[in-house]
Amino acid sequence: MRTRQKGFTLLEMVVVVAVIGILLGIAIPSYQNYVIRSNRTEGQALLSDAAARQERYYSQNPGVGYTKDVAKLGMSSANSPNNLYNLTIATPTSTTYTLTATPINSQTRDKTCGKLTLNQLGERGAAGKTGNNSTVNDCWR
């Protein structure tokens, strides 16, 4: 009578490797999308902070209007704390401004939302779209 050998067969190993490959093929892109979505909050925070500083500057400098200079807003850098977004201020008027957070470094992989915008009325935008559409709402949640 033959004794049964212990261990895994080559076929069993191939099946295990295939299952792991399939799981990784699903898990890694899902995780990367999660990281990109969670990093958007940094761009949103950058815009909200800059908007509050714009309003403070506007109220402390009557007759001057809004500024394009981030240094005048008391910001040490135009980049977000983790260097995921860069803040730009479109040429402001005495009564309007538009802030844009442009993704930089690893956040440039965000193809869904891309640039986030915020204006003096509190209107949010994303990927060149403004208003209350699903893309903007998804990007700002």
Curated annotation (Swiss-Prot):
InterPro entries: N_methyl_site, PilE-like, Pilin-like, T4P/T2SS_Core. It is found in: Cell inner membrane. Disruption phenotype: Mutants show lack of surface piliation and twitching motility. Although piliation is abolished, PilA stability is not affected. It comes from the Bacteria. Gene3D superfamilies: Glycoprotein, Type 4 Pilin. The keyword Electron transport does not apply. Pfam families: ComP_DUS, N_methyl. It is a single-pass membrane protein. One of its GO terms (biological process) is pilus assembly. Keywords: Cell inner membrane, Cell membrane, Disulfide bond, Membrane, Transmembrane, Transmembrane helix. Methylated by prepilin peptidase PilD at the amino group of the N-terminal phenylalanine once the leader sequence is cleaved. Essential component of the type IV pilus (T4P) that plays a role in surface and host cell adhesion, colonization, biofilm maturation, virulence, and twitching, a form of surface-associated motility facilitated by cycles of extension, adhesion, and retraction of T4P fibers. May stabilize interactions between the major and a minor pilin subcomplex required for efficient pilus biogenesis. NCBIfam families: IV_pilin_GFxxxE. This is Type IV pilus non-core minor pilin PilE. It comes from Pseudomonas aeruginosa (strain ATCC 15692 / DSM 22644 / CIP 104116 / JCM 14847 / LMG 12228 / 1C / PRS 101 / PAO1).
